[in-house]
Amino acid sequence: MRLSTAQLIAIAYYMLSIGATVPQVDGQGETEEALIQKRSYDYYQEPCDDYPQQQQQQEPCDYPQQQQQEEPCDYPQQQPQEPCDYPQQPQEPCDYPQQPQEPCDYPQQPQEPCDNPPQPDVPCDNPPQPDVPCDNPPQPDIPCDNPPQPDIPCDNPPQPDQPDDNPPIPNIPTDWIPNIPTDWIPDIPEKPTTPATTPNIPATTTTSESSSSSSSSSSTTPKTSASTTPESSVPATTPNTSVPTTSSESTTPATSPESSVPVTSGSSILTTTSESSSAPATTPNTSVPTTTTEAKSSSTPLTTTTEHDTTVVTVTSCSNSVCTESEVTTGVIVITSKDTIYTTYCPLTETTPVSTAPATETPTGTVSTSTEQSTTVITVTSCSESSCTESEVTTGVVVVTSEETVYTTFCPLTENTPGTDSTPEASIPPMETIPAGSEPSMPAGETSPAVPKPEVPATESAPVPEMTPAGSQPSMPAGETSPAVPKSDVSATESAPAPEMTPAGTETKPAAPKSSAPATEPSPVAPGTESAPAGPGASSSPKSSVLASETSPIAPGAETAPAGSSGAITIPESSAVVSTTEGAIPTTLESVPLMQPSANYSSVAPISTFEGAGNNMRLTFGAAIIGIAAFLI
């Protein structure tokens, strides 16, 4: 006997309805019976006999009408209809593509000036009028659709020649540019004058000439030349000597920006002429020679302090209702130079060889240039047809400072003296360029002390100790420490040499000054290190307040001696670099819970507890029926 699929489904549904009538757990039978009656009240009506007819017919019927008909039907109507309204909304942005069509009207506006090209055709009889559009070559590029139009003004060959006369137009504001800085240029070299103190000292004549070129299309190149020509005359009794002539010429090329405005700056010419005559007196009839040694030194300190000005010229060009502005910046070039010549004459007689040491000359003149430089950044904005372009131009000031010192020593020897033949020696130190804000240059042979900087940037080593000549430093006990000097603005990662520790069991004694190498002074010790001087035969125990876990900057040169020291020691000159760190590194531990209790905790039992064993039994019967049906098929 084979059952059809419809019969199997009917049997399965019937068995499910029978299996669902098992008494429910936890008093949830009413809910299950209501669901069963809703599904199978046509087949099985026995449970409906126990209840009144109002409950069987009205109540169960109310649920299917509300849930199956009204509620489910409302959702498909609301939900599909509402999304149907949304496709209408994307149609609204379709109105926006119509708005970009409005900017399409703007390209028609630039086409309006394209209608004007026939207008310049009318004044073509007047050659000066088409000259204005000829200054703007990019404008004929816009009406490229009309190639014959630019050919019309091209019929007049003298027209492009006329705009060539216009370059002097931007030169109009340049009439006052050279006049501003040239008012104070002649005053600078007139200040340094050298009074004549002794007839032997040559008189120094300083002549300053300043010239300001007129405005022209080409730039003027300033030239600065300083020439010194010493002249000396020696009598016949003195061997002939020659003095070299030193001429220094420095030429500074002109810096002309790429514009139609030339840069014009004044130039100053400094000429120094020294004339000297030395006549040594000799006694020919006596056996004792007389030697006259004259040394002349001239020092002319030259200090130039100038407040530089920068001029910005704005050139505006307008054509066809479009204006273009361009800015040109002019600067000032200052050149400071100094020439110093030292000449020493050492004539010797022919009869007795005399050894004379050349005089030691120490230049006293210094050249110091203090300039407050400023850099100007100019932003040039060019606008054309609703589009602007910005470009930045940086201008500065060029300052050149040079110093030239010439040392010449003449020491001729007689013919009777054998051996050493000395030739004139001339040492010319190189040109020094002193930037703005730097220290004045020191003459050769001197060691300038290191000046401590007020602000030390990060990762900077300790300042260099001061150097003194050999044997000039007084002896100082090894255990003695100079007073501490606090540093200002030292960064956290500054590295400083560690103090020098003497070995145990030794006694500190005063250190003898060295003769071959310059001594190094002890530098100041930072606060936090104490050292006591060690007396002879007494034990000294310095205490250090620096903990093992704390590091503090220590200046170079600090020396400490442990207790119980005896015997002489040699202080080493090497120092180790220790990287220190100021301040403690904070450590914060924060505990974060892994799981946080839910704020929406509910005391209502889950739905699975209400379904109870009825659902489980129904699933069991259903599985059994499906298995039987599959077996029969």
From Swiss-Prot:
Glycosites: 240, 285, 600
Q: What are the sequence repeat spans here?
A: 46-58, 59-69, 70-81, 82-91, 92-101, 102-111, 112-121, 122-131, 132-141, 142-151, 152-161, 162-171, 172-179, 180-187
Q: How does it sit in the membrane?
A: Lipid-anchor; GPI-anchor
Instruction: Tell me the segments the record calls region Disordered.
Output: 40-306, 411-569
Q: Where is the lipid attached (GPI-anchor amidated glycine)?
A: 612
Entry PTM: The GPI-anchor is attached to the protein in the endoplasmic reticulum and serves to target the protein to the cell surface. There, the glucosamine-inositol phospholipid moiety is cleaved off and the GPI-modified mannoprotein is covalently attached via its lipidless GPI glycan remnant to the 1,6-beta-glucan of the outer cell wall layer. N- and O-glycosylated.
Sequence ranges of Polar residues compositional bias:
414-425
Where does this protein chiefly localize? Answer: secreted
User: Where are stretches of biased composition, namely Low complexity?
Assistant: 42-114, 172-183, 193-306, 507-549
One GO cellular component, as annotated: side of membrane
Q: Please list the residue ranges that the record marks as compositionally biased, kind Pro residues.
A: 115-171
Q: Name one GO biological process term.
A: cell adhesion
Q: Which residues form the signal peptide?
A: 1-27
Q: Does the keyword Repeat apply?
A: yes
Keywords linked to the UniProt accession = Cell adhesion, Cell wall, Glycoprotein, GPI-anchor, Lipoprotein, Membrane, Repeat, Secreted, Signal
Keyword check for Repeat: yes
Write out the annotated subcellular location.
Secreted, Cell wall; Membrane
Q: Which residues are assigned to the propeptide feature?
A: 613-633
Q: Give additional notes from the record.
A: As a major cell surface protein expressed during infection, HWP1 detection can be used for diagnosis of invasive candidiasis. HWP1 epitopes can also be used to develop vaccines for protection against candidiasis.
Q: Its biological function? A: Major hyphal cell wall protein which plays a role of adhesin and is required for mating, normal hyphal development, cell-to-cell adhesive functions necessary for biofilm integrity, attachment to host, and virulence. Promotes interactions with host and bacterial molecules, thus leading to effective colonization within polymicrobial communities.
Q: What is this protein called?
A: Hyphal wall protein 1
